Amino acid sequence: MVEETAEFPIDSEVSNSTEADDDDDDFAGDHSPPLDMLVETSGAIYDALTLIGLLEAVDKPGEFEIHTFAYLSCLLHIYDGHPASSWGYSFSAVPPALPFSATLSSTLENLLSMGLLTRSHDESASPTEGSIEVLADSHSAIRLELTAAGKQEQKFLSSLEVMRHREKYLKAAGSTSLVYSVPAVVNSLVYEPQLWQAARTVGARKLLVAISSRPLYDQFEALKDALGRDAHHLSVPATVYVGYLEESARGDFNPSDQTE
């Protein structure tokens, strides 16, 4: 088993209070350029633009898919040895078992109002199958896409040194959609230990809090043992981890039991 001081440093500050995330709601009405917005939302701006750009090449994503791939990116950030609190914004689990960030949600709305994103309704879309079909019924047909201005802004943000450390996590998370479908990745993440535990509780629950993170530590430790601990492209552990979670989805068991 991994000690609490292991290389996956999720700490008690990881998941900020809901009040802290709610403070970001004021951001939704700000129409100033992205770089002039609050410092704590800059990562969310870059993440949203980058993930939409990556995923729209495969299948134009909806908002809840952006939240899920951003959460997967944060997990890879942790896998790479960084504390989740340094990701820049926190996540909560919302029923039935999806990761959600108030910061990211308000960022998407602001980018839409600024003309950096467009929102369309896909009449041909069918509800996502599996454990998230409740949300899929109302959201699966809503698609997000970068505008020309959005692509230009993403390119500019990518050139900034302060954003470059995020790029490899976003790209690795996005690469899983080339192996599995976007809905399959979303459904698989439901079996991530934090989300699995949240599905057994009532109401929203903060994610990546130290006291509940031992199963995630153990999964990542086992993954590093299997793949080797030398530096390697993060798309490999990302794809293997999603594949493991997909296997979990095919059976009815608690993924945290696999590490005991």
Protein language model annotation of sequence segments:
Residues V2-E260:
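Domain-edge interaction signal
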